[in-house]
Amino acid sequence: MQVTFLGTSSGVPTRARNVSAVALRLPQRAELWLFDCGEGTQHQFLRSDLRLSQLRRVFVSHMHGDHVFGLPGLLASLGLSGNSNGVDLYGPDPLESYLQGVLRNSSTRIGYPLKVHRVRDAAEQNLIVFEDKDILVRCTPLTHRVPAYAYRVEQKPKPGHFNLERAQSLGIPPGPVYAALKRGEQVSLDDGRVVDGRDFCGPDRPGASIVFCTDTVFSEAAVSLAAGADLLIHEATFAHSEAEMAYQKQHSTSTMAAQTAAEAGVGKLVLTHLSPRYAPGNPVTPNDLLREAQAIFSNTILAKDFLSFEVAPRCNSS
């Protein structure tokens, strides 16, 4: 999985940072997933190496404008391109009526299947939001001024490495049989033997896990959702000195994000959703927020627009 930050500012864009959007590229399935879609996100796509035509799913944290104002235009542009097989959207209850209203009142025809999934029940009941043979997605309610949700994306474990030499030594013929054994399945051979793929594969290889957490003040629910994740993307709207304002506005400080990462035992923390007040040259800068967080959780980095990197399970990392 590859993460690309398309917007890392809170509230309004700045010259250096657009508002919230994070892309998750899944190369093995030629898909792109998007987490939030602030105004101008489709322009950020044009400045990146991402392909909008690969967009398959959009996960919306909450309905504040800096997280959703870019969505109607992006979906409309995807429709004009004529090469989408459909998009599934996941988010708060008002998401569907918001999109329907904008598209209807602007006489916009999408031209491809568009389905909206409400996540409130899944979040409150700890149910799975999305699952297929490779990936599952969970979510949890956050603490914000409007209903907001954090999302966790997990790759399912894959069978361990196949012991080819052992299969050959037992006279198992190559071909489709090997493919089934690699999947850990039981196979009946032509000579009557039944072999179990699990006997030919090493331990399962864990998949990577990513948590997207915004907007919220410090939340125990977020700690639970992020437990053991390889990557936590967490809002850090305010510096520690603005903790009182953070509580009032129900946003996180840099230290709240770091506390979440530390308590959850994640592999890496990325700070995003930074207030424009912390622009370089001001009394407090983004690097100050980074230092505050690193004092609590050392493996913390600062997001910037177009930052992109691969996310791998920690046990497979160098």
Curated annotation (Swiss-Prot):
Q: Catalyzes what?
A: Endonucleolytic cleavage of RNA, removing extra 3' nucleotides from tRNA precursor, generating 3' termini of tRNAs. A 3'-hydroxy group is left at the tRNA terminus and a 5'-phosphoryl group is left at the trailer molecule
Q: Quaternary structure per UniProt?
A: Homodimer.
Query: Which catalytic residues are annotated?
Result: D66 (proton acceptor)
Superkingdom in the source lineage: Bacteria
Q: Which cofactor does it need?
A: Zn(2+)
Q: What class of enzyme is it?
A: hydrolase
**InterPro entries reported in the protein's UniProt record:** Metallo-B-lactamas, RibonucZ/Hydroxyglut_hydro, RNase_Z/BN
Q: How is the cofactor bound?
A: Binds 2 Zn(2+) ions.
List positions binding Zn(2+) 2. D66, H67, D215, H273
Described function: Zinc phosphodiesterase, which displays some tRNA 3'-processing endonuclease activity. Probably involved in tRNA maturation, by removing a 3'-trailer from precursor tRNA.
Positions annotated to bind Zn(2+) 1: H62, H64, H144, D215
E.C. number(s) listed in UniProt: 3.1.26.11
Pfam families from the xrefs? Answer: Lactamase_B_2 (PF12706)
Give the similarity note: Belongs to the RNase Z family.
GO terms assigned for molecular function: 3'-tRNA processing endoribonuclease activity; zinc ion binding
Q: Which PANTHER family match?
A: ZINC PHOSPHODIESTERASE ELAC PROTEIN 1
Ordered alphabetically, the record's keywords are:
Endonuclease, Hydrolase, Metal-binding, Nuclease, tRNA processing, Zinc
Q: Does the keyword tRNA processing apply?
A: yes
Q: Please state what the protein is called.
A: Ribonuclease Z
User: What is the species listed in this Swiss-Prot or TrEMBL entry?
Assistant: Prochlorococcus marinus (strain MIT 9313)
